[in-house]
Amino acid sequence: IIVTHLTHSCLRSVLEQIAAYGQVVFRLQQFIDEVMGHSSESMLPGSGSVPKKSTEAPFRTYQAFMWALYKYFISSKEELAEIEKCIINNDATITLAIVVDKLAPRLAQLKVLHKVFSTGVAEVPPDTRNVVRASHLLNTLYKAILEYDDVGEASEQTVSLLFSLWVETVRPYLQTVDEWIVHGHLWDGAREFIIQRNKNVPVNHRDFWYATYTLYSVSEKTENEEKMSDNASASSGSDQGPSSRQHTMVSFLKPVLKQIIMAGKSMQLLKNLQCAESTTCQAGARDAERKSLYTLFLESVQSRLRHGEDSTPQVLTEQQATKENLMKMQSIAERHLELDDVHDPLLAINFARMYLEQSDFHEKFAGGDVCVDRSSESVTCQTFELTLRSCLYPHIDKQYLDCCGNLMQTLKKDYRLVEYLQAMRNFFLMEGGDTMYDFYTSIFDKIREKETWQNVSFLNVQLQEAVGQRYPEDSSRLSISFENVDTAKKKLPVHILDGLTLSYKVPWPVDIVISLECQKIYNQVFLLLLQIKWAKYSLDVLLFGELVSTAEKPRLQEGLVREQDTVAQFGPQKEPVRQQIHRMFLLRVKLMHFVNSLHNYIMTRILHSTGLEFQHQVEEAKDLDQLIKIHYRYLSTIHDRCLLREKVSFVKEAIMKVLNLALMFADGWQAGLGTWRMESIEKMESDFKNCHMFLVTILNKAVCRGSFPHLESLALSLMAGMEQS
C-alpha cells in the first residue's frame, strides 16, 4: 500500500493512533490464548496478563469471559475483512481518514474493553484466589454497565457490548446457582463461587443449617477480604456495610443472595431427607424437560428486548395518554426531591420516567412519608437493574418459594415439626397441665415431708409415670436430671429446686429448629414455673384446721392452766392466740393472692397468648430460616416477659423474695403455732408489704411509660391486693 500524499509525521500520527489499539488487541488476544492453553510462555514483559500456573486450568468465569472476547473478535475480524475487500476491489476512493472513521466505533469499543480488562483481570494481584478474581471481574463489568447506562442514549452501543459480555461471563455463576437451588449440589471445583461448602459438617448434623456454608465478601474500595459464616440468619451480605462499600462480592446477586442461600440449603436438606423416593424417576424425567436458570434468564432478556421493539410504535401513539401520567409523577417526584433540598426539574422528569416503569409506584408512595435509602444501588441507572429485576430475580424467587415451601411441608407433615414444638410447650412450659401436675406434686410432697427427692431414678420414674399415661410417644424422649448448685442459694427454700433440668431428645432434622441452646431457655422458664407452682401448691394445701388444732390441742388435753403455760412460752404477747391465728390467716390469703396473680399472669397472659401468636407465625413461615428466627424470637419474648433478663433481675429478686416468704410461711404453718413468735409474723408481714409495694410501684411506672404493656394485667392484679393490705 502506497500513501504518497502523506508526510512522514502525518502518517506516523495516524499509525500511532491505530498501533495503540493494536496493542490492546494483542493483550486481549494474549489473554484468550492463555486461557485456551496456547502460547502461555510468550507474554510481553510487564503486560500483567493472567498470572496462573500453566498446570492449573483457568476457572470457568475466566473461560466464559475469554469466550465472550473470542466471539467479539470474530465479528471484529469480519468487519475488518469487509473493509479490506473494499480496498482491494478499489470500488471507491479510500483514504486513511476514511478507514479510521469507519473503525472509530470499533476503536471506541476496544477502549472500553481494555479498561474493563485492565481493571477486572490484568491489575488483579498474582496470588489472588479464584473466588475474588471471578467476583471482581463480574463486578467490574456490572459497574461499567451501570456507569455507561447512566449516560443514556449516547452510549447505547457500549452498554449493548458490555451487556453481551456480562451475559456470557455470568453463565458459570448462574449455572452454579442453578445446580445448587435445583439439585441441592454446590458444584464448584475451582472455588470461584462466593458461597463455599464446608465439607467437615455432614448434612445430617444438627449444625448443618448454621455452619455448612461460608459467604466470602470483598470490599471493592479497600480490597480487604472477609469471611462471613452464614449463621442462623443465613442472610449475610444482604445488608452488609454502608454505602461506601456497597459493591461487595457480585453486586448483581445481592438482592437475591438470601433467597439463593435459603433455596440451596433447603434443597440439599430435602435431597438428604429422601422423603420422596417413589418420585425419583418422575423428578428425573421432569428435570430433563426443565430449562436451566441461565436459559430462562436469556429467554426473559430476549422477550423483554423484543417487547421493547414491538411496543415502539405503540408508545408513539400512546404519548398523549402517558403525558398526563408523566406530569403527575413529575410533580410527586419534585415534592420528594424538595424534602432533601434538591430543586432539579430534569432530575424530577427522569425520576418520573423511571417510576412509570415500575408497577408498584403508587403502592410505594401511597404511604405519605418516604425515606429514600441512599445506600441502595445506583438509583439513577434503573434500565439495566430493571432488566435484572424482571428477567433474573423472579426465576430465583420462584425456585426459592418452591423448594423452601416443599421443605417446610415435609418437616411439618413427615417429620412432625409442629407436634415437637407443641411437646416442648406441653412439658417445659407446662401446657400439658394435668400431666405435669402429677409429676411436680410428687416432688413437692416429698419436700414437704422432708424426704429425699433428689434421686435421679425417682425423678425419672415419676416423670415417666406422669407422661406415659397421656403422651406415651413422648415418654421415651423425656428425661430429667439434677445437679447440685451453689450451697449458699440452697439455704433459701425457693432455690432448693435449682439444678433440675428437663431434657427432650429431638430427632434430626427437627433439632435444627429445637436446638440444645433453645432447650436451655426452655429450662430457665421451666424452673421459674416450678418455683411459682411450688409456692402456690405449698399455700394451697395448708388447712385452717391444722393451725387451729395446734393452738387448741393443749387446752383440750390439760385444761386452762396448761393453756396459760403454753401462751407464756410463746414469749410476751400483746395479742391473744386467736388474734395471732387471724393474722396468719390474713397473711396466707395475701400471699395466695400474690402468688395466684403471678401464676395467672405467666400462664395466661404470657405463655398462652404468646403461644397462640407463635402457632400462627409457624403456619405462615416461608422457609426454615424464617421458622428458626420465629422460634428463637418466641423464646426470647417469653424469656423477657417472665422477667428472666439480666436487665430486670431486681424485679425477679423481689418476686423470689415473696415466693421464699410463702414457702417459709407454709413451713411454719405446718410446724404449728407453737413454733411461731410474734416478731416472726410481724417481720414476715413487713417484708411482704415492702416487696409488694416495690413491685406495684415498679410495674406501674413501666406500664405508664408504655415500655411493657404486657405487665398491665399483673400490675392491676397486684394493686388489688395492695388495697386489701
From Swiss-Prot:
Keywords for this protein: Cytoplasm, Cytoskeleton, Microtubule
Pfam families: GCP_C_terminal (PF04130), GCP_N_terminal (PF17681)
Gene Ontology terms: biological process: cytoplasmic microtubule organization; meiotic cell cycle; microtubule nucleation; mitotic cell cycle; spindle assembly
Main location: cytoplasm
GO MF entry, a single one: microtubule binding
Region (Disordered): 222-246
Gene Ontology, cellular component aspect: centrosome; cytoplasm; gamma-tubulin ring complex; microtubule; spindle pole
Annotated InterPro entries: GCP, GCP_C, GCP_C_sf, GCP_N
Subcellular location: Cytoplasm, Cytoskeleton, Microtubule organizing center, Centrosome
UniProt xrefs under PANTHER family: GAMMA TUBULIN COMPLEX PROTEIN, GAMMA-TUBULIN COMPLEX COMPONENT 5
Stated family: Belongs to the TUBGCP family.
Subunit structure: Component of the gamma-tubulin ring complex (gTuRC) consisting of TUBGCP2, TUBGCP3, TUBGCP4, TUBGCP5 and TUBGCP6 and gamma-tubulin TUBG1 or TUBG2. TUBGCP2, TUBGCP3, TUBGCP4, TUBGCP5 and TUBGCP6 assemble in a 5:5:2:1:1 stoichiometry; each is associated with a gamma-tubulin, thereby arranging 14 gamma-tubulins in a helical manner. Gamma-tubulin at the first position is blocked by TUBGCP3 at the last position, allowing 13 protafilaments to grow into a microtubule.
Summary of the function given for this chain in its UniProt record: Component of the gamma-tubulin ring complex (gTuRC) which mediates microtubule nucleation. The gTuRC regulates the minus-end nucleation of alpha-beta tubulin heterodimers that grow into microtubule protafilaments, a critical step in centrosome duplication and spindle formation.
Protein name: Gamma-tubulin complex component 5
Organism of derivation: Macaca fascicularis (Crab-eating macaque)
Gene: TUBGCP5
